[in-house]
Amino acid sequence: MKTSVFFGTLAAAGLAAGVAAAGTLDDVKAKGFLQCGVSTGVAGFAFTDASGEWDGFDIAVCRAVAAAVFGDAKAVKFTPTTGKTRFTALASGEIDMLARNTTWTFSRDADLKFTFVGVNYYDGQGFMVPKALGVSSATELDGATICIQTGTTTELNLADYFRANNMKYEPVPIETNAESQSKYLAGACDVYTTDASGLAATRSTFEAPGDHVLLPEIISKEPLGPLVRHGDDEWGDIVRWTLNALIIAEEKGITAANVGDLAAAAGGDPEINRLLGTEGEYSSMIGLDAKWAVNAIAAGGNFGEIFEKHIGVNTAIGLARGLNAQWTQGGLIYSPPFR
């Protein structure tokens, strides 16, 4: 999901610069764990299971980074954040990275001073309505009441879309996905709008998901991905290349099941050898153990395995890969070369 840019948040930007200068990798190692900011809960993306353990598509990125740094995917603690609190938590150093359905935008980079290390889900804003409302297009929503998370790009996109289509709406402000779901199901709003993936995730938790419709319009680009503070390129490289390692692993057929065997000795693919530490001294370039990528992949699998386990077509959420397929399969998922 996205969270809005608060222009002029110079204090947050100053905090980010000061904290980053301290050296995040050293701080993380000194603590003995990674502190990862996540959402307050979105089915499939970030949730706690029956035993209270965090799991999900975004959670897997945090665990992969922990595994890359410590060799232990459990060396991570999670800080739930809302659309309003996530950026302050990152800028202040309360968290070491943010992996929380957050849209990469110009202002968040240039004004708030955050570095988006990549995209792990290409999304767009959509609309969900009760089937009983009898609406088949977002262009029929003139005068509707709409549940909208505050502090998000969703707010801005919604205003732009309705203005461009000469329509009016009444916003029903909410702060968390759980609050949105509760108010929407209680009839406090006609429509719920957020990232299409978030709508699918939310609908999957309903008692009667078939009673609710996702309208066909996608009104924005929402490249979602993990982010860190400006000013600490070493730490940014670690998080960036951990994500890239998961993407390369899928492209090359490296899985959680076979990564150990492939890393046991150099094989015929030079890029696999470089990634898994059997050729060259690449790990020293980012200050990690030679098996950092092996550990990251073993933690939860490659990018495709993580996607299919948590949000893919065989889950309750049922998302097709679409734009999030590998570039070789017509999607946008693509890593720079590991060389």
Model regions and ranges:
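Acidic, polar ligand-binding/catalytic clefts
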Residues: R63, A67, G71, A75-E140, ...
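Extracytoplasmic small-molecule ligand-binding "clamshell" domains
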Residues: G23, A30-A99, L288-A293, F303, ...
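Extended ligand-binding regions for polar small-molecule ligands
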Residues: A60-R63, A67-V69, A132-V135, T139, ...
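Extracytoplasmic/secreted envelope proteins and their assembly/folding machinery
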Residues: A22-L25, D58-A66, K84-F87, A91, ...
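Bilobed "Venus flytrap"/periplasmic-binding protein-like clamshell domains
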Residues: Q35-G44, W54-V69, T103, D123-Q181
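Extracytoplasmic/periplasmic, Sec-exported soluble proteins
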Residues: G37, E53-D58, F78-T82, F87, ...
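Sec-exported extracytoplasmic/periplasmic mature domains
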Residues: K29-A30, A66-K74, A91-I95, A132, ...
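Gram-negative bacterial Sec-dependent N-terminal signal peptides
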Residues: M1-A21
